[in-house]
Amino acid sequence: MANILILNGASRKNGNTAAIIKAFSEGAVSAGNQVREFYLQTMNIHGCLGCEGCSRAGKGTDDPCVQKDDMSEINKAFMSADVVVFASPLYFWTISGPLMTAADRLYAQLRSLGYSKFPRKSVLLMTAGGSDYSQAVRWYETFERNLGWTNLGEVLGAGKAKEAERLGASIK
């Protein structure tokens, strides 16, 4: 069983991204996994200050960031997550602003732990009316590679609920 953390960067709570997350989650739960989703659009998460306060926090601290906003809750869930799912509609050929902000803020947690010493598995779920996901996929693959994470799969495009469900069910 895996603990799966979903960072939902969609602006529409019941849009295409929500549909693909729902299918993925149903598959994951059917395989015995636990899923926790954060809908970032309604959360109060500020951008990274670049102050390096996190570098002075103790290793493995639940929340090493000096900013105390809703990211604190995500940081705590991140510590016990085996799989991190980045879910977003395609905005201006990349991931949404809320998802980028949350991903940037993971810096505090990863900085205090030592980047490559906190291996995770990850998934990318994206939807769009268009089809050019290349910039978003490059961001995701760079993020993973630099952290030493393992890509479990990508589902790119609306209307791919079955594919998302199969991916979720494949996680053990």
PLM features per residue range, with description:
Residues 90-92, 129-130:
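Short glycine-rich anion-binding loops that position phosphate/pyrophosphate groups of nucleotides
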Residues 97-98, 111-154:
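Short, glycine-/small-residue-rich phosphate/pyrophosphate-handling segment
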